[in-house]
A protein has these predicted regions:
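A late C-terminal transmembrane helix in Major Facilitator Superfamily
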Residues: 119-160
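Loop-to-transmembrane helix entry
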Residues: 32-51, 126-133
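Intracellular helix-loop hinge segments at the cytoplasmic ends of transmembrane helices
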Residues: 28, 106-121
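C-terminal transmembrane helical hairpin of 12-TM major facilitator-type secondary transporters
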Residues: 69-112
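Pair of pore-lining "gating" transmembrane helices in MFS-fold secondary transporters
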Residues: 2-21, 99-103
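Helix-to-loop junctions at the C-terminal end of transmembrane segments
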Residues: 54-68, 153
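Multi-pass alpha-helical transporter architecture, strongest
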Residues: 164-190
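Helix-loop boundary and gating motifs at the non-cytosolic
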Residues: 17-35
Length: 190
């Protein structure tokens, strides 16, 4: 019933959904024409997630300095920019784009999951339940939209996948901006 938590649950679902959809299809994209990379090279594309892991800790520092209300929309927009740039076929654009996408995703998730707990403690006082609800929505979104990403890839290729996932991340950007308009809870400022 708390609107801030509801938006955070949706952000988690949509963000992981887009992330899983993209990285589920990365092997198919890079093993097909024009790349035709062997499996051992395609597997290397998952190393971009190391940058995302670093981004999670950096986003914590950014949240401490600038606040969740500023970091979340920026991270969501970064995710969207990285995603859209993957539409190109040139590797020197696609690889950095996947890195930016991963960085944005991990920053959104780290910010959202921390915000859920802080908002729940300050508001309804049920941090465990809120964290569980976030996890459920996060993984439901990942499995549902990850599957839809495969369908989009099958019918429309990478451009169809990018269209689907860009729609999801655009909603995340909108929801992150809406979170800025929801008044902070008095006890914590979240």
């Amino acid at each position: 019933s708390e609107p801030g938590l509801a938006l955070l649950f949706l952000i988690g679902a949509l963000t992981l959904g887009a992330y899983q959809a993209v990285f589920n299809m990365v092997p198919y994209r890079f093993s097909a024409a024009p790349y035709l990379f062997p499996t051992w090279i395609v597997s290397g594309f998952f190393l971009v997630n190391a940058f995302g892991s670093l981004a999670a800790s950096v986003s914590g520092n950014l949240v401490a300095r600038y606040g969740r209300r500023r970091v979340m929309p920026f991270a969501a927009l970064l995710t969207l920019i990285g995603l859209v740039l993957t539409i190109f076929e040139t590797l020197w654009i696609v690889i950095p784009a996947l890195i930016v996408f991963a960085i944005g995703f991990f920053a959104v998730h780290a910010t959202a999951s921390g915000w859920v707990t802080a908002r729940a403690v300050a508001g309804v006082g049920a941090a465990g339940q809120a964290a569980s609800a976030y996890s459920i929505s996060y993984y439901l979104g990942g499995s549902s939209f990850g599957t839809l990403g495969g369908i989009a890839w099958y019918h429309w290729g990478w451009s169809g996948l990018v269209t689907l996932t860009a729609t999801l991340i655009s909603l995340v950007v909108i929801f992150a901006l809406l979170l800025r308009r929801i008044p902070p809870l008095q006890k914590s400022g979240y």
